[in-house]
């Protein structure tokens, strides 16, 4: 080895000089560089390392993963906190914590994804339920824990509602015999809508399909004087009732009003739920109703006492607990007259007589003796165009101004032109729905709205024809089984309902014409007090009219008498009313022509503006051609 080395050194010395070439090294190392380069020839394109400084990679499914994590957090919040209000607060707190930790983006926690999280939550619930069923082996094991978990699941499912997840409830706008109307804000588009919620009795699949078909017909109405219907859907409402150790209770109806109370309710409806909470009970129908406090000795054993009472619990800061039921889900419904599911809850030795649901309530607060029964009633939701000013509000404001005016000649409080415009648009809307084969059956100032700066008339709150499966808020019959005069036998308030409606006989489109006659009187006759109004409107049934109205507005008075005739066949139709002298007087014609002239002037101004823009564009193009260089 030493000799070899000396030979190499000798050859190097002999070949030394400036032109000598050094022998290549045995291993060729690349030059040092701050950016390491790798052989990427065999690496797929989607996995190649970027040449830029190392960054946390972002994948297309990162948002989906975060949404799933947010859905899991919401699911855990609902399971561990049954109270809807507090569970939402817990969910928001968890989201804020995960956002601060950098595990979530605030974007994925926004309300715009609430409907998507709803589908995730349902899938998680069904997955957990299936997994537990597969793991459970012993059918004789203790079911108390399972029952508790099931009650938690019901509490969660009650909150996975389309209404609760997609809308924020702002205020109550009104209530009627079959439902309440709420002002809501859509969490996704931020727009305000009106949603009417109608409670349906225990119904079959056929009944539900009938309701949905009719709602779809209403949603298809397209007319300037009809409130726009956007969509409709059905959700479940869980009603929990005691079964074994509690007697059947005939709960007092809170919605039954006297004649005077009915009139006062018209003024106070917007402040109806300003208090902390209220409970609305619908008519109970056990086999043998007992008065509050009475016991039923026949049902003190293990026999189940089934209820069909619908219980809707409201609170100022809390919504009803509902579970969405889409139309496609109706195929799975049973054909029984009522849909119900046995739901045993934990036993307790105390049952509070005043069953309330506030933000402090939870499973620990809602305790019943023995087993309980949860009945699944249906809640129909109808999303409509928001119209906050009703004709009732307009008339009330007009009456207020009339009371403040001392000199009638100096204060034209009747405003005949405006009243005629309102009534004409109302008749045009009624003519449209009658031509579509629909009878409104509940026309009154509170169901008629004035929309926009020009106060365009909008007819809303259509009564459903299938009223036999709708859950009324009160029992309109007295103890003798006869109809009380406070309300109609079907739908509508007695002051505006036709005689055939009050008598419970057959009625048709002419029943709406009677209501139009009453509204026509209110438009042209101010009232100083509510008692005066009730007396005058009641007198219409016997053909009595105020003398001042007959002298001041003879044409209107004539048609009021025609419209309120007892014999429905003698009442004019909507098309006959539109062709009558009621809308053909010189004053009305002048007013209509003035409105058309104003509209035509606006249209002409808009066309002139468009022509100017077109001429300017043409001039710019011509200048570009002359200059040779386009701008």
Swiss-Prot record:
Signal sequence range: none
Catalytic activities: L-seryl-[protein] + ATP = O-phospho-L-seryl-[protein] + ADP + H(+); L-threonyl-[protein] + ATP = O-phospho-L-threonyl-[protein] + ADP + H(+)
Region (Disordered) location: 1-34, 260-301
Chief site of localization: cytoplasm
Residue ranges of domain Protein kinase in the record: 167-583
Enzyme Commission number: 2.7.11.1
Keywords: ATP-binding, Cytoplasm, Disulfide bond, Kinase, Nucleotide-binding, Phosphoprotein, Protein synthesis inhibitor, Repeat, Serine/threonine-protein kinase, Transferase, Ubl conjugation
Modifications after synthesis and translation: Activated by autophosphorylation; phosphorylated predominantly on serine and threonine residues, but also on tyrosine residues. Autophosphorylation at Thr-488 is required for kinase activation. The active autophosphorylated form apparently is largely refractory to cellular heme fluctuations. Ubiquitinated and degraded by the SIFI complex once the mitochondrial stress has been resolved, thereby providing stress response silencing. Within the SIFI complex, UBR4 initiates ubiquitin chain that are further elongated or branched by KCMF1.
Location relative to the cell: Cytoplasm
Site (Heme-binding): 80
Regulation acting on activity, per entry: In normal conditions, the protein kinase activity is inhibited; inhibition is relieved by various stress conditions. Inhibited by heme: in presence of heme, forms a disulfide-linked inactive homodimer. Heme depletion relieves inhibition and stimulates kinase activity by autophosphorylation. Inhibited by the heme metabolites biliverdin and bilirubin. Induced by oxidative stress generated by arsenite treatment. Binding of nitric oxide (NO) to the heme iron in the N-terminal heme-binding domain activates the kinase activity, while binding of carbon monoxide (CO) suppresses kinase activity.
Spans of repeat HRM: 410-415, 552-557
UniProt binding sites for ATP: 173-181, 196
Record PTM Phosphothreonine, positions in chain: 285, 486, 488, 493
GO molecular function: ATP binding; eukaryotic translation initiation factor 2alpha kinase activity; protein serine kinase activity
First-level EC class: transferase
Protein name as annotated: Eukaryotic translation initiation factor 2-alpha kinase 1
Designated gene of the protein: EIF2AK1
């Amino acid at each position: 080895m030493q000799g070899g080395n000396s030979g190499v050194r000798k050859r190097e010395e002999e070949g030394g000089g400036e032109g000598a070439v050094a022998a290549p090294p045995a291993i060729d190392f690349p030059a040092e560089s701050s950016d390491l380069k790798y052989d990427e020839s065999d690496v797929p394109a989607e996995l190649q390392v970027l040449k830029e400084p190392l960054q946390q990679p972002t994948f297309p499914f990162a948002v989906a993963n975060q949404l799933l994590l947010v859905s899991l957090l919401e699911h855990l919040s609902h399971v561990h906190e049954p109270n809807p209000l507090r569970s939402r607060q817990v969910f928001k707190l968890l989201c804020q914590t995960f956002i601060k930790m950098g595990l979530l983006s605030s974007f994925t926690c926004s309300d715009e994804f609430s409907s998507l999280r709803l589908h995730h939550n349902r899938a998680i619930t069904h997955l957990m339920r299936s997994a537990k069923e597969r793991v459970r082996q012993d059918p004789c094991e203790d079911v108390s824990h399972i029952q508790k978990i099931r009650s938690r699941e019901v509490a969660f499912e009650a909150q996975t509602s389309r209404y609760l997840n997609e809308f924020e409830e702002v205020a109550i706008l009104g209530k009627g015999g079959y439902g309440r109307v709420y002002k809501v804000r859509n969490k996704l588009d931020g727009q305000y809508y009106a949603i009417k919620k109608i409670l349906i009795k225990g119904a079959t699949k056929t009944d539900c399909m009938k309701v949905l078909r009719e709602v779809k017909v209403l949603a298809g109405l397209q007319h300037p004087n009809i409130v726009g219907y956007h969509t409709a859907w059905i959700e479940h409402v869980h009603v929990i009732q005691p079964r074994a150790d509690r007697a059947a209770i005939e709960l007092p109806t809170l919605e039954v009003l006297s004649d005077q109370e009915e009139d006062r309710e018209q003024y106070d409806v917007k402040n109806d739920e300003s208090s902390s909470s209220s409970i609305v009970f619908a008519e109970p129908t056990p086999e043998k109703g007992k008065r509050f406090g009475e016991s039923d000795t026949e049902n003190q054993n293990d026999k189940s006492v089934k209820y069909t009472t619908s219980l809707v619990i409201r609170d100022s800061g809390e919504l009803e607990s509902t579970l969405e039921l889409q139309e496609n889900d109706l195929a799975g419904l049973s054909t029984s007259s009522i849909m119900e599911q046995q739901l045993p809850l934990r036993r307790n030795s105390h049952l509070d007589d005043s069953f309330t649901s506030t933000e402090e309530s939870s499973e620990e607060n809602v305790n019943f003796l023995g087993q309980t029964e949860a009945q699944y009633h249906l809640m129909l939701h109808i999303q409509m165009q928001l119209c906050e000013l009703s004709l009732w509000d307009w008339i009330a404001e007009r009456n207020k101004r009339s009371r403040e005016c001392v000199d009638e000649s100096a204060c034209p409080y009747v405003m005949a032109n405006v009243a005629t415009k309102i009534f004409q648009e109302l008749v045009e809307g009624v003519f449209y729905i009658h031509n579509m084969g629909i009878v409104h059956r509940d026309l009154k100032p509170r169901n008629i709205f004035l929309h926009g700066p020009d106060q365009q008339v909008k007819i809303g709150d259509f009564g459903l024809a299938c009223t036999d499966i709708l859950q009324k808020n009160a029992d309109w019959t007295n103890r003798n089984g006869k109809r009380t005069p406070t309300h109609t036998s079907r739908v509508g308030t007695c002051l505006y309902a036709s005689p055939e409606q009050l008598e419970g006989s057959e009625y048709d489109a002419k029943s709406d014409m009677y209501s139009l006659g009453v509204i026509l009187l209110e438009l042209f006759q101010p009232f100083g007090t509510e008692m005066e109004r009730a007396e005058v409107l009641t007198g219409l049934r016997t053909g009595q009219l105020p003398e001042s109205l007959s002298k001041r507005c003879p044409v209107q008075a004539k048609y009021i008498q025609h419209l309120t005739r007892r014999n429905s066949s003698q009442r004019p139709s909507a098309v006959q009313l539109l062709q009558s002298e009621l809308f053909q007087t010189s004053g009305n014609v002048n007013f209509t022509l003035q409105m058309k002239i104003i509209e035509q002037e606006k249209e002409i101004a808009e066309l002139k503006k468009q022509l100017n823009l077109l001429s300017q564009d043409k001039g710019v193009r011509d200048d570009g051609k002359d200059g040779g260089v386009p701008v």
